[in-house]
């Protein structure tokens, strides 16, 4: 049976670290919001049949955007995990797989989605990059306790790619247990699965701090050349 590919974008966060007057996904670069740039990547990828966008109930910005008919809005939750779960609960398709992607990660390239979709193991897969910087563990006083061995450490990115039913069950269970679910893979891991790590690109950055905007603008400009 052919699997359908659906993208879910949690976009209900406020992005407090950006120190901006609006959620970071609505900041503008090159004439479009970060969210629109991210949606463009998914809309232009042929295998993605639908995009589910989880936004805050009182979001005053989403109505100002011209959204493609392939985009379905759902109400976001108080956490990322709840927003993603709400998106998954809106999926009725059988044999569906989901690409969960950060709304503020606009520089994703189609070649990286290709690599994820090559994975057919139901354990799923995530984009990630090997850690190259030296990693220090700190105590409560922000003093170094030890230097970590980085040889087997990877930095998780998105998209993260899983069968809808498996991810839905994993997130539901994790939320009920009060687990610290920082990404979809962490819920999958708690359910006993071992997702694949697919090497991504460092320019697939998540805009988190003010200084990230200039770098994202550079990458977006380069990608359009």
Curated annotation (Swiss-Prot):
Residues of the site described as Positions MEP for the nucleophilic attack: 150, 206
Xref: InterPro entries: IspD (IPR001228), IspD/TarI (IPR034683), IspD/TarI_cytidylyltransf_bact (IPR050088), ISPD_synthase_CS (IPR018294), Nucleotide-diphossugar_trans (IPR029044)
CDD domains xrefs: CDP-ME_synthetase (cd02516)
Residue ranges the record marks as coiled coil: none
Keyword set includes Ion transport: no
A Gene Ontology molecular function term of the record: 2-C-methyl-D-erythritol 4-phosphate cytidylyltransferase activity
Pfam families documented for this protein: IspD
Site residues, Transition state stabilizer: 17, 24
Pathway linked to the protein: Isoprenoid biosynthesis; isopentenyl diphosphate biosynthesis via DXP pathway; isopentenyl diphosphate from 1-deoxy-D-xylulose 5-phosphate: step 2/6
Keyword Nucleotidyltransferase: yes
Broadest EC class assigned to this enzyme: transferase
UniProtKB keywords: Isoprene biosynthesis, Nucleotidyltransferase, Transferase
Documented EC number(s): 2.7.7.60
Gene Ontology biological process terms, A to Z: isopentenyl diphosphate biosynthetic process, methylerythritol 4-phosphate pathway
Catalysed reactions, as listed in the record: 2-C-methyl-D-erythritol 4-phosphate + CTP + H(+) = 4-CDP-2-C-methyl-D-erythritol + diphosphate
Family as reported in the entry's similarity comment: Belongs to the IspD/TarI cytidylyltransferase family. IspD subfamily.
Purpose: Catalyzes the formation of 4-diphosphocytidyl-2-C-methyl-D-erythritol from CTP and 2-C-methyl-D-erythritol 4-phosphate (MEP).
UniProt-recorded name of the protein: 2-C-methyl-D-erythritol 4-phosphate cytidylyltransferase
Organism: Haemophilus influenzae (strain 86-028NP)
Taxon lineage: Bacteria, Pseudomonadati, Pseudomonadota, Gammaproteobacteria, Pasteurellales
């Amino acid at each position: 049976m052919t699997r359908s590919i659906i993208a879910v974008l949690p976009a209900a966060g406020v992005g407090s670290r950006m120190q901006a007057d609006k959620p970071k996904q609505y900041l503008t670069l090159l004439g479009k919001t970060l969210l629109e740039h991210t949606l463009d990547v998914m809309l232009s990828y042929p295998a993605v049949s639908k995009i589910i966008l989880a936004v805050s109930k009182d979001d005053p910005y989403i109505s100002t955007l011209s959204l493609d008919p392939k985009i379905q809005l759902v109400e976001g939750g108080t956490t990322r995990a709840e927003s993603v779960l709400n998106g998954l609960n809106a999926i009725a398709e059988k044999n569906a797989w989901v690409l969960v992607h950060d709304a503020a990660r606009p520089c994703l390239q189609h070649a990286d989605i290709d690599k994820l979709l090559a994975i057919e193991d139901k354990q799923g897969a995530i984009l990630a990059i090997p850690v190259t910087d030296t990693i220090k563990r700190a105590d409560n006083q922000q003093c170094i306790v030890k230097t970590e061995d980085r040889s087997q450490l990877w930095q998780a990115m998105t998209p993260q790619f899983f069968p809808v039913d498996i991810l839905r069950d994993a997130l539901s269970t994790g939320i009920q247990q009060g687990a610290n679910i920082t990404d979809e893979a962490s819920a999958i891991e708690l359910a006993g699965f071992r997702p694949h790590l697919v090497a991504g690109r460092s320019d697939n950055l998540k805009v988190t701090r003010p200084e990230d905007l200039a770098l994202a603008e550079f990458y977006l400009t380069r990608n359009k050349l």
